[in-house]
Each structure stands twice: as structure tokens, then as C-alpha cells.
């Protein structure tokens, strides 16, 4: 597959043209990549008005992912989330009242800032009480979604869309096919934050990508699981989305810089050639190595590694339950760090490791050696290790659902605010969402009154201060 952006920039760098244009480094500098860092010069196209090499590269990505249309972002899925919500708002019927989005509660804070910027309300989908034991995970069954939509209809409210995160930070995958069928039966678009799942289209057993499973709008953080520089992402449109080319590019431009990174654009462009060539084979090798490691861990410490297989598990994320070792997630992450392995995420219970198709045999061997050593040294599972308590999340959900909303998300985010100790925040209006990052998933959302039930979760996830609306 051709790489028009990469080819253009390399030719330009080889010409040694006198650069009387931005950026200021003029193709020279300490990093060594400066000669490939350009701006929208003649022939370089423009990301938000693409008609040349960028449009050609995006057409390649569209073909690879099998979507109706795929667009690039150099500012991560956060930009794509805002853009697809803007597009969904434009698709709703005129004079439909105040807009509301039905969203799973484990949404990234980018959704909340989109709500503040676009001024819509959210109606939250909470997990069933017995499935609510982790901040990152919010399983939603099709039957529960259908019931929630029926309840909103009985109140005379119709959401402009349904929003899900899948896969989530711990590797849980929603039933996108079943949930999309419910959405479409109600005449609603399904929007999916697939930031962690760009690779799902390239599985040897067939695509598990949300667009192929019925989602209407979807974002992928290419940089999370593909060989792409940080910030590279995709906005995917399904065939049901009727927005014209200008509307989509304007939606992205509304939330993006007028100086997109050409290094990231080249990275997205170069990835097309990799995806079209050897990526599926490399991905399969990575999955085989990961499966072997999980089987070894199951033999060493049953329950340590969460399953990689099954309809609700993603196959490229190794999630470790540190309680199986009598450790906290943070302790296990530190033990790995001391042995030369840096994890993606750790909380009081879990550690998340994210290998990819680019992970080498030597890197897997290092991880294997580290985990074998830790398993050999760690005590047997200690019941004193604090487990995630489903009752704590269920209590928070009940408290938040029962309270009247005094501020919209927009009003709370834009209001004068102050930082106070989290323990003193009860009864105050949350201004900025209270999150730990990663995973940047709020415990209390902007506009909600902080209930006492939030305090144990603040403590558990290390949130010591809260931004509240000034009184």
C-alpha cells in the first residue's frame, strides 16, 4: 500500500529547500526528526480541508478498516470523541428539546468536557450491582439498554445517541452487536469509544471492530495498540451516518489545532503499509506468546491473570489481579518496575500490561522472568488485601441517581471553582470531574453533588483533592 504523506515529506527533506516557513527549527535540531516536521506547505495538503495526499492516505485507512469513511486525528481519541458527539447532535431532529446522551458511566473525562463544550446532558447507564466492582468497567446488557431507553421514552425524553466504552481499561468488551441492534430498533446511533481496540479489526478469526459490529460512529486511538506515534487516532463512520465530508472535517476542526503534527500524520500514513502487509501475522504471534504466558501464570497462581478469551474479553491486554499474590495493584506494579517492566496502569486491585504486535520475544521473556520471580517471592493470597467492593459502587450509583441535579455539566465546568480536600467535599457541587489518570474515569461528574458514598472511592483511587463550585 502506498504512503503518500511519508513519500512527500521525505522528498521535501531530500531537496534541501530553504525553509522560510514554520516551524522555527528549520529542519534541524537535537531530536533528529526535525527535517520531517513540516507544516501545510504547497503540496502537503491540509488536514481539515484534505484533497491531496492526506485524503489519499485516509482513503487507504478507510479501505483497511472497511468503514464508510475514516479520518485522521493528531490529537488523540479525545478530539474524535468531541467530533463524533458533535456529529450525533447535528443528526438529531430539530426542536427535540434539551439534548441528552445515554452513556455508560465508565466514560473517559473527554466525554464530560465534550458535554461542557456542546452543552448536552447525560443520563448514565450504571452496571448491575453485582458487576460494579471496578471503576473502569461498566457492563451493559442489551436488555438493560432497552429498558433504559423505554424509561426515557416514558418520560418524554429521547437521547440523541448511546455512548459506550469498549474495550475498557481492564479489557472488558461490550456486546456491540447486541447493543447496536437495540439502538437501531429505537432509531438511535451507537457511538463507541474504541480507543483501546484499533487492532480488533485485524484478528485472524475475523474483525471484532465496533464498526463491523454495527456501531455508527467510533474512535480508535491508533497509538495505543498500533505502530503509531502518540496522538495518532481515527474517527470512523459507519454506512448509516449521512454527514457530508465538510461536516465531518468541520467537526474535527472545531476541536483541533490549526497546526496538526505532520510527524503524527506520517506515522498514521506509514501504519497503513504495515497494516496491509505483515501486521496480522505479527499480531497473531503476539497473541500466541501472551496466551502461553497466561497459561503459565494460571499454573503458578490461579486467578492472577484475567482471561484473554471469551466474548467479553479483549485478546491483547494482560490484566493481573494482584490480590492473587497477596499484593495491591500498586505493589505488583512496583515489583515489576524493579525488574525492568513498566506497566500501563495500576490501581488498588489490578495491573494492566499492554503488549502489542511490536513486542519482541525478548520483551516477553523479560516479562515472563519478572512475573515468575514475583510469583515465587509473593506470599499466598492474603484475605486482608482489599478487594473491589461492588456494594461501594452500587451505593454511589444509588446516591447520585437519587439527588436532584443543580448544575448542568457545562455550568459546573465553567463556574468559578476551588480545590478543597476530598474529605471535605461532601455536599459540594463537583466542578472538574474527580478522576485519577490513568484511567481518567470520573468517580463524581461535573454538576453532581458529592455524596458521602464517594469518599471511600476517593480514598481507594488516591484522589486527595476535589474541584468544587465556589459558594
Label each residue range with its predicted role:
Residues 1-52:
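N-terminal "arm"/small-domain region of PLP-dependent enzymes with the aminotransferase-like
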Residues 2-10, 76-306, 322:
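Conserved PLP-enzyme active-site core in the AAT-like
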Residues 34-79:
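Conserved N-terminal alpha-helix of the aminotransferase class I/II PLP-enzyme fold
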Residues 68-70, 97-101, 443:
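Short active-site oxyanion
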Residues 72, 124-126, 220, 345, ...:
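Structural signal for conserved beta-strand scaffold positions within catalytic alpha/beta enzyme cores
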Residues 298-452, 457-462:
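Conserved C-terminal alpha-helix-loop-beta "cap" of PLP-dependent enzymes
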Residues 428, 467-470:
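Flexible, glycine-rich loop/tail regions that form catalytic "lids" or insertion modules at the edges
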Amino acid at each position: 500500500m502506498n504512503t503518500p504523506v511519508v513519500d512527500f515529506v521525505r522528498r521535501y527533506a531530500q531537496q534541501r529547500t530553504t525553509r522560510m516557513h514554520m516551524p522555527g527549527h528549520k529542519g534541524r535540531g537535537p531530536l533528529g526528526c526535525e527535517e520531517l516536521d513540516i507544516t501545510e506547505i504547497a503540496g502537503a495538503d491540509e488536514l481539515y480541508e484534505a484533497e491531496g495526499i492526506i485524503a489519499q492516505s485516509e482513503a487507504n485507512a478507510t479501505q483497511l478498516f472497511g468503514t464508510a469513511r475514516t479520518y485522521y486525528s493528531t490529537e488523540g481519541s479525545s478530539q474524535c470523541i468531541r467530533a463524533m458527539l458533535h456529529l450525533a447532535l447535528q443528526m438529531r431532529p430539530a426542536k427535540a428539546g434539551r439534548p441528552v446522551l445515554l452513556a455508560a458511566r465508565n466514560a473517559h473525562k473527554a466525554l464530560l468536557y465534550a458535554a461542557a463544550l456542546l452543552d448536552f446532558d447525560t443520563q448514565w447507564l450504571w452496571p448491575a450491582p453485582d458487576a460494579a466492582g471496578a471503576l473502569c468497567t461498566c457492563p451493559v446488557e442489551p436488555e438493560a439498554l432497552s429498558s433504559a431507553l423505554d424509561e426515557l421514552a416514558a418520560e418524554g425524553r429521547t437521547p440523541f445517541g448511546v455512548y459506550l466504552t469498549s474495550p475498557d481499561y481492564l479489557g472488558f468488551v461490550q456486546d456491540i452487536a447486541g447493543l447496536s441492534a437495540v439502538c437501531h430498533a429505537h432509531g438511535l446511533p451507537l457511538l463507541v469509544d474504541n480507543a483501546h481496540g484499533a487492532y480488533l479489526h485485524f484478528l485472524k478469526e475475523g474483525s471484532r471492530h465496533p464498526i463491523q459490529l454495527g456501531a455508527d460512529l467510533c474512535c480508535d486511538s491508533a497509538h495505543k495498540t498500533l505502530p503509531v506515534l502518540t496522538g495518532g487516532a481515527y474517527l470512523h463512520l459507519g454506512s448509516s451516518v449521512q454527514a457530508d465530508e465538510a461536516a465531518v472535517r468541520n467537526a474535527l476542526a472545531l476541536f483541533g489545532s490549526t497546526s496538526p503534527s505532520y510527524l503524527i500524520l506520517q506515522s498514521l500514513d506509514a501504519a497503513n503499509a504495515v497494516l496491509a502487509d505483515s501486521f496480522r501475522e505479527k499480531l497473531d504471534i503476539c497473541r500466541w506468546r501472551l496466551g502461553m504466558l497466561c497459561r503459565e501464570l494460571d499454573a503458578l497462581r490461579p486467578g492472577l491473570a484475567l482471561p484473554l478469551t471469551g466474548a467479553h474479553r479483549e485478546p491483547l491486554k494482560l490484566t493481573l489481579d494482584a490480590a492473587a499474590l497477596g499484593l495491591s495493584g500498586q505493589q505488583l506494579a512496583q515489583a515489576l518496575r524493579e525488574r525492568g517492566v513498566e506497566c500501563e496502569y495500576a490501581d488498588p486491585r489490578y495491573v494492566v500490561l499492554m503488549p502489542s504486535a511490536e513486542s519482541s520475544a525478548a520483551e516477553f521473556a523479560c516479562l515472563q522472568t519478572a512475573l515468575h520471580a514475583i510469583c515465587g517471592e509473593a506470599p499466598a493470597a492474603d484475605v486482608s488485601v482489599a478487594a473491589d467492593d461492588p456494594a461501594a459502587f452500587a451505593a454511589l450509583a444509588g446516591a447520585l441517581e437519587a439527588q436532584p441535579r443543580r448544575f448542568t455539566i457545562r455550568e459546573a465546568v465553567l463556574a468559578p471553582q476551588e480545590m478543597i480536600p476530598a474529605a471535605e467535599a461532601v455536599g459540594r457541587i463537583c466542578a472538574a470531574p474527580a478522576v485519577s489518570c490513568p484511567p481518567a474515569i470520573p468517580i463524581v461528574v461535573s454538576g453532581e453533588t458529592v455524596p458521602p458514598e464517594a469518599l471511600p472511592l476517593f480514598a481507594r483511587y488516591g484522589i486527595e483533592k476535589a474541584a468544587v463550585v465556589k459558594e
